[in-house]
Curated annotation (Swiss-Prot):
One Gene Ontology term from the biological process aspect of the record: tRNA methylation
Coiled-coil region: none
Chief location: cytoplasm
Stated family: Belongs to the MnmG family.
Name used for this protein in its record: tRNA uridine 5-carboxymethylaminomethyl modification enzyme MnmG
GO cellular component annotations of the record: cytosol
Positions with a binding annotation for FAD: G14, A15, G16, H17, A18, G19, V126, S181, Q370
Domain of life: Bacteria
Cofactor(s), names only, from the UniProt record: FAD
């Protein structure tokens, strides 16, 4: 029996990483928000790897934080090891990665959600959407409760018609043995949503006491811990190690002899998995020339003996997993606590979404996370944050908040999804960003915090921290330009760091341009340095000065990019009626309905000649609107 259970501004369906960010963003912007999840015990659950960040993904976490999201803050509270990756390369690809304590990550996020004003958390399974005139009006739960709202955000993760595979065994399930959602996907299909089937997988968890760490290589965290959140200065914490080992020829033999029992190789699963996170079967088959593969043994938390076997995702039968693990160096006595599995699930074709993450043909219905075809906690959180923001802005009748490819990795992520779509679970990488020297993780607050404050999400305290850092950077760069040092003073330091000597006085600014000279090195000859300058500002000053020419070049490229992005395409355009457009271009443009000429140019199947036709059409349209004048 259905009953009216209440009215809200925004309803969020799902409490994974996308759902948490969506609900918190909506509530913090003043919207009366309801968050529904199938179980309160799975909030911000990490069903796969126990880490946050990494190459490309760390950039997303920093951007989420700069906008006012929670992932960075929660990771800083709960990490057990932290490392900055790619430090031997340029700053554009430096990426922070932290091992999180899974249980603490969940409990801390749950606590944050429970204590957030304007946000109500309830356990319930959503089985239907309330739709009137192609507009969502609310949701219906399995118990018959009808919750009404202005906007609904779907953040259902891998639960829609979830099915787990372990060798020849398969059964309907969500991740980690939780209940799947079996009804909502069918409803979405009836509403005209083009749903597809993706898959992902996770390795076994083994008992810590069954691992021989003496045969493995210890990997420690960084001594100087860099926080994810711009709200944190420095963090001191005792860290735990991870361990590196390798597969053996015997491992590969066990896999190949049982390949026909793998759910994927048996043909039981026809869905598409993540390209950049292949199963161990895939790695052994595709890279048969490699004698071994790296395996990392990672702790799941401080209060558990479970260890995550990174690099051994599989859908082989449990007894084969056991035999396979025992052939890995140091795992000869390994005891499985949770078997590895593959999981299939339904998700939406993201080209059906607007850049705001609103479903094009269902007004006020937004979505985020793996439901949109991505993989990874960070990609999910980024989308959830943007969906939450835009759901509130639409409720208020305000302009949407859309980041383009030159402003954020979040912009790259969403633009790729809604413009190009994806035929496999999408993963963020630094190589996807054209302007990565501008979109560094260290300057995410410089790029995004002020924008977020203007829409009512970033707090005043966050804005003030950003403004202080900004002033420190500006003042320090000015001071470095004005401060000259003599050859007598500078040359001993330059010689010590194998940099060419100077014959006349030179500014600290010009000295810092040299690759061998760091901001830290200059301290020895820089008596007037402001000791209170924040660490982040010091790092930014050095990057801005060292890469000045490259940054200026990229900014010029962005100016050209913006010219096409700023040419808006009216949504009422009939592309089938534009002479000169190729048939494929007409179909693709009609389906995706790009917001700008720039977005249109990135659609697969739209050629440069089609863009030229569009530009001519827009100019003709402008002249007609102006009465035929120029």
């Amino acid at each position: 029996m259905k009953y009216n259970a209440g009215t809200f501004d925004v309803i969020v369906v799902g409490a994974g990483h996308a759902g948490c960010e969506a609900a918190l963003a909506a509530a913090r912007m003043g919207a009366k928000t309801l968050m529904l999840t199938m179980t309160l015990d799975s909030i911000a659950m990490m069903p796969c790897n126990p880490s946050i960040g990494g190459t490309g993904k760390g950039h997303l976490v920093r951007e989420i934080d700069a906008i006012g999201g929670e992932m960075g803050i929660n990771t800083d509270k709960t990490f057990i090891q932290s490392r900055m990756l790619n430090t031997g390369k340029g700053p554009a690809v430096h990426s922070l990665r932290a091992q999180a304590d899974k249980n603490k990550y969940h409990t801390e996020m749950k606590k944050t959600i429970e204590n957030e004003p304007n946000l109500l958390l309830k356990q319930a399974e959503v089985v239907d959407l309330i739709i009137e005139d192609n507009t969502v009006k609310g949701v219906v739960t399995r118990s018959g409760a009808s919750f009404y709202s202005h906007s609904v955000i779907l953040a259902t993760g891998v639960y829609l018609r979830g099915k787990i595979y372990i060798g020849e065994v398969n059964y309907e399930s969500g991740p980690n043995g939780l209940f799947p959602s079996m009804h909502l996907s069918e409803k979405l299909t009836k509403l005209g949503c083009n749903m597809r089937r993706f898959k992902t997988g996770t390795p076994a968890r083994i008992h810590q006491d069954s691992v021989d760490f003496s045969k493995m290589e210890e990997h420690l965290g960084d001594e100087e811990i860099v926080p994810f959140s711009f709200m944190n200065d420095g963090i001191e914490k005792k860290q735990v190690p991870c361990w590196l080992t390798r597969t053996t020829g015997e491992t590969h033999r066990v896999i190949m002899e049982n390949l026909n029992r793998s759910a994927m190789y048996r043909g039981d699963m026809e869905s598409v998995g993540p390209r950049y996170c292949p199963s161990i079967e895939d790695k052994v088959v595709r890279f048969s020339d490699k004698p071994s593969h790296q395996i990392f043994i990672e702790p799941e938390g401080l209060d558990t003996k479970e260890m995550y076997v990174q690099g051994m995702s599989t859908s082989l039968p449990e007894e084969v997993q056991d035999a396979m693990l025992k052939t890995v160096i140091g795992l000869e006595s390994a005891v499985i606590m949770r078997p590895a599995y593959a999981i299939e699930y339904d998700c939406i074709d993201p080209t059906q979404l607007k850049p705001t993450l609103e479903v094009k043909h269902i007004e006020n219905l937004f979505s985020g996370g793996q439901f949109n075809g991505t993989s990874g906690y960070e990609e999910a959180a980024a989308q959830g944050l943007m969906a939450g923001i835009n759901a509130v802005l639409k409720t208020k009748g305000e302009e949407p908040f859309v980041l383009d490819r030159s402003e954020a990795y979040i912009g790259v992520l969403i633009d790729d999804l809604v413009t190009k779509g994806t035929n496999e679970p999408y993963r963020m990488m630094t190589s996807r960003a054209e302007y990565r020297l501008i979109l560094r993780q260290d300057n995410a607050d410089m790029r995004l915090t002020e924008k977020s404050y203007k829409i009512g999400l970033a707090s005043k305290e966050r804005l003030e921290r950003y403004l202080l850092k900004k002033s420190h950077i500006e003042e320090e760069i000015t001071r470095l330009k004005k401060t000259n040092v003599s050859p007598e003073k500078a040359n001993p330091i330059l010689e010590e760091n194998k940099s060419s000597l100077i014959k006349a006085g030179m500014s600290l600014y010009d000295l810092l341009k040299r690759p061998e000279v760091t901001y830290k090195v200059l301290k020895k000859i820089d008596e007037n340095r402001n000791v209170d300058i924040v660490r982040d500002a010091q790092e930014q000053c050095e990057i801005i000065i060292k890469y000045e020419g490259y940054i200026e070049k990229q900014l010029r490229q962005i100016d050209q990019f913006k010219k096409l992005e700023n040419k808006i395409l009216p949504q009422e355009i009939d592309y089938h009626g534009i002479d000169g457009l190729r048939l494929e271009a007409r179909q693709k443009l009609s389906d995706i309905q790009p917001m700008s000429v720039g977005q249109a140019s990135r659609i697969s199947g739209v050629s440069p000649s089609d863009i030229s036709v569009l530009m001519i059409y827009l100019e003709q349209r402008r002249r007609q609107k102006n009465g035929g004048g120029t």
